[in-house]
UniProtKB/Swiss-Prot annotation:
Cellular component terms per the entry's GO annotation: plasma membrane
Catalytic activity: GTP + H2O = GDP + phosphate + H(+)
Protein name (record): Elongation factor 4
GO molecular function, one term: GTPase activity
Protein's membrane topology: Peripheral membrane protein
Amino acid sequence: MVKQENIRNFCIIAHIDHGKSTLADRILELTQVVSQREARQQYLDRMDLERERGITIKAQTVRIPYIAADGQEYELNLIDTPGHVDFNYEVSRSLAACEGALLVVDATQGVEAQTLANVYLALDHDHEVIPVLNKIDLPSAEVDRVKAEIEESIGLDCSQALPVSAKTGMGVDAVLEAIVHHLPAPKGDRAAPLKALIFDSWYDSYQGVVVLFRIMDGSVRKGDTVRLMSTGKEYEVLRLGVFSPEPTDVKELFAGEVGFLCGSIKELGDARVGDTITHADRPAETAVPGFKEVKAMVFCGLYPTESEDYENLKAALEKLQLNDAAFSYEPETSQALGFGFRCGFLGLLHMEIIQERLEREFEVGLIATAPSVVYKVVTMDGKTLEIDNPSHLPDPTKIDTLYEPYVSMDIHVPNEYVGNVMKLCEEKRGTQKNLHYLAANRVVVTYELPFAEIVYDFFDRLKSATRGYASMDYHPLDYRASDLVRLDIMLNSEPVDALAVIVHRDRAYTYGRGLALKLKRTIPRQLFQVAIQAAIGQKIIARETVSAFRKDVTAKCYGGDISRKRKLLEKQKEGKRRMKRMGNVELPQEAFLAALKVGDE
C-alpha cells in the first residue's frame, strides 16, 4: 500500500485538439502501464465516437505506479475529463476529485475559450495548475507568445511552464516529475467515517451500474454496506477495484485513492454524478459539497422514419439513458409525424452526439424536429408554466408574460474578425458586455444572448464568419421577459405541430417568409395544390403555393364539340377538389432540416 503523501490525483485540462488524449497516451506508455503493443491512439477514449470527433465525452481514470527520480514510489491517478461546455457539471465533479491539474495549451494556437472555462473551474477548487506547452516540435510553435498569453489571460506564472511534444514523447518525463513535486498530496483522514465522491457512473449489462469514485475520508472494503447520501439507498459492495487501465480488483481502498465499485445498483439515476457514498452503519455527517441535479437545457422531438421502428427507438433510448443520466425523454405524438419522443439534452453537442449514437449504434432512422429551449410562461391567472415544446404554448390571450433563458458567452477571436462576430451577435439579439485584448491580435468578446438564438445555427455561422478561428464558451445566466410569439406553419389550412417555433415578434415575419419559401422548395409537388401558410394566432403573415401537377385530359379529343372538352375539364376539377379535401401532404425529412436553416441565404 502506498503512503497517502505519495498519492497524486490530477487531471488534464485542454481545448479540443490541443493534445490532451495524446499526452495521456504518452504518460501511460512511459510509465509502462500500457505496453507499446497494446497502445492505440487516444487510449482512454473508449467510444468510437470520441475517437472520431477527437473529443472526450465520459470521464475515465487510470492508476499509474511511478518511481520518481529520487527513488520513491508514487501512485498517480489520472482522471481524464470531458472538455466541452455541455459537460461542464461532469468536469466540475471530476475536478473536485483531484488536487491538481495539467493545463495543456497548443503552442501553435494559444489559449482558447474552453481552456479558460475549465481552468477557472480548476482554480475555483483551489487546484495547483501546471502549464504544459504542447506541440513544440512543430515549426509554427510560438512558445514565448503563448506563455505571455497564459500569464495575461489566466494569471498563471509561466516561468516554470513545461515544453513538451506529446506526439514524439519529448519532455513527458519532466511532466511526471512536476506532478510529483508540484502537486499536493490528497488530504483526508483514513480513520474517519467513509466519505467518497462519485464523479462518473455507467451501466454494465453484467454488473449493473459501475460507479467511479474518489475517497475523501475513511476507507471501503469489499463486502461493506454503503449508503448513497442523496437518495438514502443502501447497497452491498460486491466488487471493488481500480483501473490500471484495465479493471483490477482490490480488497480495500483508502482516503485519497480513486477506484470503482459495483453493488447491484439497477438504475443510473440511483448513483448520480456528484453524490456522496458513505457507510450504512457509520455514516459521515455531511456530504461532499457541490452536488446538484443536472437539468436539460435543449429539447427536441425525435421520431422514427419508419413507424414500425418505434419500439426499437424506445429500446435504444432506454439503453442510452442507462449511460447518461443527464439525458431525458418522454413519449409524445405529433399529427404530422406519428409517435415519437420529446428528448432533453445538456446542450447542442450533447444533442448531436445522442442523435449520432442512435443512428450508428442502434441503426434507427430518425427525424429530428427543430431544437427548442425551456420557456417560462406566467398566465393571466398567475400560474407559472415551463414550456419545452412550442406546440404546448397556451393561447396568446391567456399569456401575461413570457420569459426566455439568457446565456453569457465569451468568444475568442483574432482581431480582424471582431466586426463579423459583433454583427452576428447583434443579429441574434445580443448585448455586448465586454471586449478585452489577450494579445496584440487576439480578442475576447463577451455577449449576453437569448439561449434560443444560439440553439439553431449560431456555432456554424460563427465559424464561417471567422473562417473557423473563433472558439466560444457559454454559461446560463437567468430568465428575462421577452416579446415572443408562436409561429405556426399550416399546410392546406392544417397546422403541422412539428414545425411550430417560438420566435421574437420582430423576427417573426422574416422567419415565417423564409420558412414558407424553404418549404415550397422541399415539399414535392402533388396532384393537387398545396398552400403553405405561416401564422401567428389567427393572422396569416406569409403564404407560398406548391402548384399541382396537371394531366392533359383533353389530349384524346380531336376537333369536335367544345362541351365534350369542358365536361372532361370539369370532371378533373371536381376530382382535384375532392383530392385536396381528402389528401394529406407527406413531409420529407428535408422539410424539418429546412426549419433549422432559415436565414442562411
